Amino acid sequence: MQREFVSGAGLGLRRALLEPFGAGDEVRVDFLEVAPENWSGSGGRRGRQFRELTERLPFLCHGLSLNLGGYAPLDMSLLRAIKGFIEQHDIRAYSEHLSACADDGQLYDLMPLPFSDESVRRVAERVRVVQDVLERPLIVENVSAYARLPGELEEVDFVRAVLEEADCQLLLDVNNVYVNACNFGFDAHAYIAAMPSRRIAYLHMAGHDEQGASLKIDTHGAPVCDPVWELLAHAYACHGERPTLLERDFNLPPLSELYAETDRIRELQRRSGEAQLRSLGYGT
């Protein structure tokens, strides 16, 4: 039976965090997220530490290799392995990127998709297959990009169309919206407002790298910048408070600095909840 979904502020689990999280101290986040490809089959001490954490805290999975946007057949052995991992560790939900990552071999990167009606139909069909195999809803994530492929749709319309055609949920990556808005010149606030609230399962926050004035790279290697924090508040204002996770893959700072960012997420969630109550006539 599928468990209750997560709430509050979460953090992406990286190997360097296993030791501090396993030291017996309280883990000051509400949930954790992992890429199943990086943890499936872990044995020995690392496997035991990971199992202890999955027994203590709610977990989400965020996949890297499913190739939702590709033309090659879906990797059914990978899907079955992911399903087993989800069941073994009582994972609350599974998400994947709206991207391609394989074509007669693994590309080891998340490649952009053409924003076309044909692409919508193909991706939606693959999402439906994944949902049937996993026997649970799939959550898809908007991705960062640095080049556009030919297509008749805008990114925002493509994402909305996939959600409706596939009847799936959205992981709204706020930093990716900001990065793409800067790189391609669209309105990040309008993009976020246009997403269907009922489809949004949770949100991602991260930092990025600036390559000059006109190019931003989604690295997950820096603190979240002020414009992205402002966009998170905007997302809550548009869609209500949602579970929100901080990603940090590189240049890991002391845990206290990561907690400062997850605490900031909680504060924005608290303010959003208070604003919602005021709009309903409660409080002053």
Where do the PLM segments sit?
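Hydrophobic faces of well-ordered beta-strands that scaffold small-molecule active sites
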Residues: 7-13, 30-34, 59-62, 94-96, ...
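Acidic/histidine-rich catalytic cores of soluble enzymes
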Residues: 131-215
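Gly/Pro-rich active-site loop or hairpin
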Residues: 43, 73, 110-120, 181-239
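Boundary/entry segment of secreted carbohydrate-active catalytic domains
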Residues: 1-21
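Acidic (Asp/Glu)-rich catalytic clusters
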Residues: 22-27, 44-61, 77-92, 128-133, ...
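Active-site acidic/histidine proton-transfer and metal-coordination neighborhood
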Residues: 75-170
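Acidic-and-aromatic substrate-binding clefts and catalytic sites of carbohydrate-active enzymes
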Residues: 18-19, 36-48, 67-77, 147-152, ...
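C-terminal helical cap(s) of enzyme catalytic domains, especially alpha/beta-barrels
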Residues: 255-276
